[in-house]
Amino acid sequence: MEIFDLTIHELHEKLKAKEVSSVEATRAMLDRIEAVDSQVNAYITVTPEQALVQAEDADRRIAAGEIAPLTGIPVGLKDIFVTKGIRTTCGSRILENFVPPYDGTAVAKLKEQGAVIVGKLNQDEFAMGSSNESSYFGPCKNPWDLSCTPGGSSGGSAAAIAARTATATLGTDTGGSIRQPASHCGCVGLKPTYGRVSRYGVIAYASSLDQVGPLTRDVTDSALLLGAVAGYDPMDSTSVNTPVPDYVASLAKGVKGIKIGLPKQYFIEGLDPDVKRAMDEAIAMYKSLGADIREVSLPNTEYAVATYYIIATAEASANLARYDGVRFGHRAEDARGLAQMYSKSRAEGFGPEVKRRIMLGTYALSSGYYDAYYVKAQKVRTLIQQDFLNAFKEVDVLLTPIAPTPAFKIAEKLEDPLQMYLSDIFTIPVNLAGTCGISVPAGFSAAGLPIGLQLVGKPFGEQEILTAAYSFERETQWHLKKAPL
Amino acid sequence: MKITREQVEHVARLARLELSEAELDTFTGQMDSILSYVEKLNALDTEGIVPTSHAVPMENAFRADEATGSIGVEAALANAPLRAQSFFRVPKVIE
């Protein structure tokens, strides 16, 4: 076992026992990045100098007996988190040279605990994508099979866990962008309830859907990292002021007697046979652990993708209006007049997927189409949210696949955006409903690619899904298998 | 057709995006197929349904009207593509 293979809690024990220092752990991680990241491209920016300064500081804290769960732990951040003095690109040319003047709240919380930030991770441009292929900084590869995508948009955050180039990472999830790459890369990814984690200092894509969450090697780490970043923040007026429970303390409670619902609309024809088999085995496992399994119905599931691509693109078109070449970001050189400076700067700075979504969103919000598209989608969102609330009257947790197939090949879906969008069918409804979901490793395809299982909880039911995930992980141990890299 | 090339050009102007001829052609086709897919929402009767703009029910969030710190002029201008003294410099607005 190398230092870079360890989980947060394993490394924490070694740091606490002074078996290893944070500087040693950080050097090991930086060496690992140097050795393998040219194959994976999980990092947009590596920050060795700052990381070693933070590691020395962590070692001083540990020597003084002030060790928190994340003190001295090398972590990576999706490049959507603004970091003071460290370039933050959001995977876009328009922010290629942007150096933020402040830290966002999640980042500040990690720093307060003494976590070591080793770098900024690859992602789809402005978190728009399901394959990490829309990044201006080149596609990220799946460590289990370098010809496959790691999923997206937090592709780098998931690939770094699988490649063991970060002990843990943070990502964001707007329509599945934590859970789907976690599933494709064989790690644990959690999207918390909307409002659980502050979005302050997270570059906005679709503000009513975006949420910050952890990608980790196991469920215990997920609980630890969520606990570290969760909580009310006056700087984000949509963050919710409810107490943050001790997510680790309740992990071992077990699943005996809990009611697990299987939404019948998620177990349909067309599900990849390997995914289907993994789900059947997981259901059997939960039965053997004493859970009460029943079928439930989420009748409006088939409308979720259409609803999402109206709401998310509409919000994106408004959020991305700020990239105008005036205060920060790319400015076109040879524009005549102010209006052309805007439209040329944006044309040069944004890639095709971002342009496509700005166009769709602008159209949906434009005069004459607002009611037909945007308001209609918001009404359907109400129905989808209602489906979940109704299901949670009958069961505690929902069990579903994360994606219809394991990781797909690079370039396979690039020419057909609609096919790419449809691959998010099992994750999008959770964002529309605003509730929480976790992806847990649940087996492998015949080709050796990881398959994830999704557990969906009630709003602020993170404890329940973490507990259910932990019971499964303890029995199956899929998470211990390592990518061949 | 759900959307014409002329409409796509109009939307590009609204969005302040200068698109090439090739991009206009590609987006017209792609937006047409996506909007055709989105049509399926019309199969649902949503008469009387309240639209959801936000997942968590919430009131306006107010804070006390007190001055707090700011990042300062130099930090605010540090990423400016072009500046003049303590201002962002832009091309002439009125010809």
UniProtKB/Swiss-Prot annotation, chain A:
Cellular-component GO terms for this entry: glutamyl-tRNA(Gln) amidotransferase complex
InterPro entries: Amidase, Amidase_CS, Amidase_dom, AS_sf, GatA
PROSITE patterns xref list: AMIDASES
Active site: 78, 153, 177
SUPFAM superfamilies the UniProt entry points to: Amidase signature (AS) enzymes
EC number: 6.3.5.7
Superkingdom, natural source: Bacteria
Molecular function terms, GO-annotated: ATP binding; glutaminyl-tRNA synthase (glutamine-hydrolyzing) activity
A Pfam short name: Amidase
Catalytic activity: L-glutamyl-tRNA(Gln) + L-glutamine + ATP + H2O = L-glutaminyl-tRNA(Gln) + L-glutamate + ADP + phosphate + H(+)
Keywords: ATP-binding, Ligase, Nucleotide-binding, Protein biosynthesis
First-tier enzyme category under EC: ligase
One Gene Ontology term from the biological process aspect of the record: translation
Subunit structure: Heterotrimer of A, B and C subunits.
Main function: Allows the formation of correctly charged Gln-tRNA(Gln) through the transamidation of misacylated Glu-tRNA(Gln) in organisms which lack glutaminyl-tRNA synthetase. The reaction takes place in the presence of glutamine and ATP through an activated gamma-phospho-Glu-tRNA(Gln).
Family annotation (NCBIfam families): gatA
Family per similarity comment: Belongs to the amidase family. GatA subfamily.
Listed name of the protein: Glutamyl-tRNA(Gln) amidotransferase subunit A
Organism phylogeny: Bacteria, Pseudomonadati, Thermodesulfobacteriota, Desulfuromonadia, Geobacterales
Curated annotation (Swiss-Prot), chain B:
GO biological process assignments: glutaminyl-tRNAGln biosynthesis via transamidation; regulation of translational fidelity; translation
Catalytic reaction annotation: L-glutamyl-tRNA(Gln) + L-glutamine + ATP + H2O = L-glutaminyl-tRNA(Gln) + L-glutamate + ADP + phosphate + H(+); L-aspartyl-tRNA(Asn) + L-glutamine + ATP + H2O = L-asparaginyl-tRNA(Asn) + L-glutamate + ADP + phosphate + 2 H(+)
A Pfam family hit: GatC
Entries under InterPro entries matching the protein: Asp/Glu-ADT_sf_sub_c (IPR036113), GatC (IPR003837)
Top class in the EC scheme: ligase
MF GO annotations: asparaginyl-tRNA synthase (glutamine-hydrolyzing) activity; ATP binding; glutaminyl-tRNA synthase (glutamine-hydrolyzing) activity
Superkingdom of origin organism: Bacteria
Keyword line: ATP-binding, Ligase, Nucleotide-binding, Protein biosynthesis
SUPFAM superfamilies (UniProt xref): Glu-tRNAGln amidotransferase C subunit
EC number, UniProt record: 6.3.5.-
NCBIfam families linked to this entry: gatC
Family of this protein: Belongs to the GatC family.
Its job: Allows the formation of correctly charged Asn-tRNA(Asn) or Gln-tRNA(Gln) through the transamidation of misacylated Asp-tRNA(Asn) or Glu-tRNA(Gln) in organisms which lack either or both of asparaginyl-tRNA or glutaminyl-tRNA synthetases. The reaction takes place in the presence of glutamine and ATP through an activated phospho-Asp-tRNA(Asn) or phospho-Glu-tRNA(Gln).
Subunit structure: Heterotrimer of A, B and C subunits.
Annotated protein name in UniProt: Aspartyl/glutamyl-tRNA(Asn/Gln) amidotransferase subunit C
